[in-house]
């Protein structure tokens, strides 16, 4: 009887773990971006970060969001915008996609590829190949499975997908560069008292 109870307990724990996993990754922290286009406020984006699944990548993003202008995300641009694909930012050193750096040094290794690009509204690290993560990131505006296993997914939009869409639809110059500067006017960290799961699906 004891052995049967042990087996039942193990199965129950396994079922709970699977159920939790089925709900999706857990948000442990939030970061906000107050956005401007051409100097005019367009709203706030709030991003949930998965600090248990990708702690090193999430911490890098949080710390860069907390830094002052010129040392992190505040004042930096979304320098590359492609409709029906993604919006890319985070190059706070050069502003054109050739710069940026992490809190760990110039670059850091890919943490893992446990999460995928499930649809619009997922946050992932931009890179120049394997193990070249710095500060640049992108937010998907469609499902992008061809990026799975190549870019580290570490967050999801919780609020402000309409702001992401405004950025996506902004007028562009050759090279996918916005005609008017798309600026993170302010950014910061929002603590999460109790981590919560998000679905593995697109943000509407």
UniProtKB/Swiss-Prot annotation:
Q: What reaction does this enzyme carry out catalytically?
A: [protein]-peptidylproline (omega=180) = [protein]-peptidylproline (omega=0)
Q: Which residues form the signal peptide?
A: 1-22
Which InterPro entries did the record assign? Cyclophilin-like_dom_sf (IPR029000), Cyclophilin-type_PPIase (IPR024936), Cyclophilin-type_PPIase_CS (IPR020892), Cyclophilin-type_PPIase_dom (IPR002130)
The GO terms this record gives for MF are:
cyclosporin A binding; peptidyl-prolyl cis-trans isomerase activity
UniProt keyword terms in alphabetical order = Cytoplasm, Glycoprotein, Isomerase, Rotamase, Signal
The biological processes this protein is annotated with in GO are:
protein folding
Induction per UniProt is:
Inhibited by cyclosporin.
Principal place of residence: cytoplasm
Q: From the record, what ranges are coiled-coil?
A: none
Which Pfam families would you find in this protein's record?
A: Pro_isomerase
Ranges for domain PPIase cyclophilin-type come to 32-189
Localization recorded for this chain is:
Cytoplasm
Q: Which residues are glycosylated?
A: 133
PROSITE patterns listed in its UniProt record? CSA_PPIASE_1 (PS00170), CSA_PPIASE_2 (PS50072)
EC number(s) recorded for this UniProt protein: 5.2.1.8
Say if the entry is tagged with keyword Oxidoreductase.
no
Cellular component terms (Gene Ontology) = cytoplasm; intracellular membrane-bounded organelle
Describe tissue expression: Embryonic, larval and adult gut cells.
The protein's role, per its UniProt record: PPIases accelerate the folding of proteins. It catalyzes the cis-trans isomerization of proline imidic peptide bonds in oligopeptides.
Of which family is this protein a member?
Belongs to the cyclophilin-type PPIase family.
Q: What is this protein called?
A: Peptidyl-prolyl cis-trans isomerase 5
Give the organism the record lists. Caenorhabditis elegans
